[in-house]
Structure formats: C-alpha cells, structure tokens
A protein has these predicted regions:
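Structural preference for solvent-exposed beta-strand-turn elements
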Residues: 1-369
Length: 369
C-alpha cells in the first residue's frame, strides 16, 4: 500500500475514528485504526465491537492495500508531523513507513485482514434530521443519563419515532429529560435504546450545521448515523425502556413563570457554598410574586429573591441544585414555566408545546432559617 494525503486531512480523519478505539481491551487488533486503500477511496476505521466509526479522507492512492496501525502511536505521530503531505507505505511484512518532509517513522503494524470490519447495515428503515437538530437533541438530554452501569438501561437514551415526531428520553432515577422534534416526513413506529457513550462521541463529531443532513437507520441490534463522510455504527441496548408516561402528569397546584437566566444565575451563585460531593439542597419558597432561594452549608448561608408570575398555591420545596442547573442550561427560552403539585412530587419544566420536558424529583430538607 502507498498513499499520499495532507497532514490536516489525516489528522481530522484520525481524530474522528479514534473515538471508537477502546481504552482497555485484551485484543490488540481493536487498539488499531484500519487504513483501507483497497478501493478508490481512502477509509479510516476504528471499532471496539460496541461502537464503530469509519470516515473517508481525501488523498491519492498510488498502490492499493490495507493495514492496521496502533491508534495511539499513529495518532501521536500524525499530530506532530510538519504541515505538509504525508506518505504512508507498507511492506509485505506489515512494516509501515510514514514520511513527511524530512521526518520518517518506521513502525510495526498488523494485517488489515485481521481487523473487525463494521457490520454492513441495509439502509431500509431510516430517518433524516439536520446535524444541528441532532447535536441539540443530544445536548438537551445527555446530562441525565446514569454515569454507571448499575442499570444498563439508564446509561442509554430512548429514541422513539411515531408519525412525524422523534422523541428522545433519558433518565437516571432522579430526573427525566424529554426532547421532541418534528420530522419533515412521517415514519413507521420505532423504539430503540442508544448507548449514551455513542451519543457523546457523535456530539463531538457533528459540526452542527443546519443545512448538513444525517441519515439515522435502524436494525434489530444496531443504529447507524451517516454523515457526509463519517459513518457511526453502534450496538443498541437490549430490553424494554422504562414506562414513563404515568409519571408525566399535566396536573399542578402551583405554576411559576420566571426569567430563565435570572433563576440559573441565582442557583449557580448558591452552589458557591457547597463543597464537591456535598448534597445540600437549595430551598425554594414560592409566594405571590416572589421566589426566595435559600441554601445553608458549613461554609455559610445565602438567600436571594426573584420576581415571578405565580398561579396557584404557595409552596416550600427543596432540590439538588445541580439537577436544576443542568436542565436550565440547555433550555434556550428566555422565560421558563415550572409546574409543582406539592413538596414531595416532581417539578416539571416544560414549554407550551412540550417540545421539552424536564422532570426533577425534590429532596427532603430541614427548613433553612
């Protein structure tokens, strides 16, 4: 194999596929990036058997071939090469010479034939969204997946298609995030659970352009995200997702409309008095026209009052401040509506069209003086 491409193209391609290289594995071939110049295009691929990423890079193929290079060594070499054309050539015993201007690296490689290729997915059952929409949906839900594997289902997100609506749901046992988007066409009903890790890596790849489109296709075991050049294939999480509809009551005893940034800034200031790992709640005292926020810790205490529009009963309720901050940060509206039933029932933050819904469970607290 002998190929030539620019350093910038190579760096970009390696950076994209490296996200699918496992940090730990007992199979050395999975620590590799496959450089495939066996056809008329140069493709780079990485695959940890759960998540696989392939991308095409521009370049010239002088001699066709295929090779698997250790991802860590390859990416570090490529990153530190001069900004010029890079030549990659292999010998019959899988030695690989990487040349750029006067720099020459000769490294051992593995046969590309041993590499685990991405599964071939027939593109039959798929939807199309913009890169911007996909990036936003991930940003507005990913923070509420569980960060450990105690319950595998909670480490993923539900993608549910019904008609022309895509609903994305995440939860961790303390909160639920729901984002709904309208698709341009109607599609067959579908429910799949996508690993959170896959979505986190995709969000790093997406440029977020409103005009660029992504095709998302489904099989029984896999989901595929097809961008302009990169293709991401991920295993799905098996099982039936949590039944959350019964938790999403539209009843409320108290409704508050408030300026989002003002509330977010106030809670953010309050967290200055909380040490990392400290689970001190923020107490919210809702009365006619005002919301008072109070917090007390070993460091000190703080209270602040914000003007609001209120419907219904007065209420005193406590929350983990981080959960409120996480939800408010991803809402783009200037004003938000908060719905409460009582001090032991969840708070709902949602818009009139319910394009987003954030459910946050309250916490027990001792009244802050």
């Amino acid at each position: 194999m002998r190929i030539v491409c620019t350093k910038s193209n190579l760096v970009k391609g390696v950076s994209i596929v490296s996200k699918a290289v496992p940090s730990k594995t007992t199979m050395p071939i999975l620590e590799c990036i496959l450089v495939d110049a066996s056809t008329d295009v140069i493709k780079l691929t990485a695959n940890d058997m759960e998540l696989g990423i392939e991308t095409r890079i521009e370049g010239d193929i002088l001699e066709r071939g295929i090779i698997a290079l250790n991802a860590k060594i390859f990416s570090e070499i490529v990153r530190k090469l001069p900004d010029s054309d890079v030549v990659i050539e292999t010998t019959s015993d899988n030695q690989t010479l990487i040349t750029c201007e006067k720099a020459k690296f000769n490294i051992a490689a593995q046969s590309g034939e041993d590499f685990s290729y991405l599964p071939v997915i027939e593109k039959e059952d798929y939807i199309t969204v913009s890169e911007f929409t996909l990036k936003e949906v991930i940003r507005q839900t990913i923070f509420s997946i569980a960060d450990n594997d105690t319950n595998k289902m909670m480490t993923g997100e539900l993608f549910e298609i019904e008609g022309n609506i895509l609903k994305v749901v995440s939860l961790d046992g303390h909160r639920i995030s729901i984002r709904k988007i309208e698709l341009k066409e109607k599609y067959a009903q579908k429910k799949v659970i996508v690993p959170g890790k896959t979505l986190q890596e995709i969000s790093k790849i997406i440029g977020g352009e409103a005009e660029a489109l992504v095709d998302i296709s489904f099989t029984k075991n896999h989901i595929v995200f097809e961008f302009d050049k990169p293709v991401v294939v991920s295993r799905l999480i098996e099982g039936e997702y949590f039944k959350i509809d019964q938790m999403l009551s539209s009843d409320y005893e108290t409704k508050v409309r408030i300026h989002k940034k003002e509330l977010l800034d106030c809670i953010d200031r309050a967290t200055l008095l909380i040490k990392e790992g400290d689970k001190k709640p923020i107490i919210i005292d809702i009365k006619d026209g005002t919301m008072e926020l109070k917090i007390k810790s070993q460091i000190g205490s703080m209270d602040e009052t914000i003007f609001i529009t209120k419907e219904g009963k007065d209420l005193l309720i406590g929350f983990n401040p981080k959960f409120l901050i996480d939800a408010l940060r991803v809402i783009d509206d200037e004003e938000v509506d908060l719905y409460f039933m009582n001090a032991k029932a969840p708070c709902f933050i949602k818009d009139e069209n319910q394009s987003y819904i954030y459910l946050i469970l309250p916490v027990n607290f001792n009244a802050v003086a």
